[in-house]
Amino acid sequence: MVIKKYIDDAVSLLRQIVAIPSCSFEEDEVAGFLCGYLEDAGLEVMRIGNNITSRLDFDASLPTLMLCAHIDTVKAADSYTFDPYNPPEAEDRILGLGSNDDGGSVVSMIATFLYFRDLKSAPVNLYLLLSCEEERSGKGGTTGLRETIAANADFAIVGEPTGMEANIAEKGLLVIDATAYGRSAHAARAEEGDNAIYTAIRDIETLRSFKFEKVSPLLGEVKLSVTGINAGTVHNVIPETCTFMVDIRPNECYTNEEIFNMLQACVKSTLKPRNLSNRSSATPAGHPLIRTAEALHIPTPTSATTSDWMRLPVPAIKMGPGDSHRSHKADEYILKSEISEGIEKYIEFISNISK
């Protein structure tokens, strides 16, 4: 069966969905468009909120592989040199917000799904999940679909821009909002107050120098970064509160609860986790997903970024077209050749998964 048609259709589809704004929690329009596209292609589709699912059952005795990619994007960076929703056309690439993260995986997985539908055969049953709210860990995305996923899939490929390498582990995500407290006073009488900014600075330095002793052979050290700070509204008042954000990328050696408790014990600021469930992930050793990647000589590195994988109740790998270094940056793009490679390698991987 000629694959070129599926590649051409995927490139065309990606241009169309890039033009539809779909920031996290604002995916209604793109979800409706993709539902219509899949239904027009002859698939039975179920929409759960702004998540889209479809099944291909070839043999009840076969396990089911889920193809999962997210349809939402981050907000466009201010430094775009073109309209992120109406980008210029280029001969070798598709430009625009979400083209690389995660539109390339979305359209490549759709093309792969349709390829096996038309082939009417595969060594596994297939389940397609196009998820929402991934970029902001929303409860309406895969977080709220654990039972649905567990009932429909035995294992999964999570589509993210990995250059079609099969990531077999990824760090988790723990975001903490911190508040340092002090006592307000006139700036001319600073000694009468207690500047919350200074407390925050001391705590930030404590966090910055904090050492996590356990190092994972797969995922390395826990990474911690302070990524935002805010205090004060006028020049002549000592601020009584100062807030800051902490981004932590855990390995599997610690639970998020353990990390949170360790950090709270060493700072004066009050810490509040946004979500404790975004755990690290690793494909079980010897799993068919790993064996298939190795048989096809696909590299199996680990990943520094997070994805829907951390919310899945089934074993998975992370693999998709594009380059993670382009994600969340201005002038985002994906190469047409990467879309082609993505579809071809997905088809090859699935065709060989039982071998």
Feature locations, PLM:
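Acidic/histidine-rich catalytic neighborhood of metal-dependent amide-processing enzymes
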Residues: 103-175
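Hydrophobic/aromatic beta-strand patches that form the interior of the parallel beta-sheet core
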Residues: 65-67, 129, 155-157, 317-319
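Phosphate-handling active-site elements
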Residues: 90-92, 112-127, 207-217, 329, ...
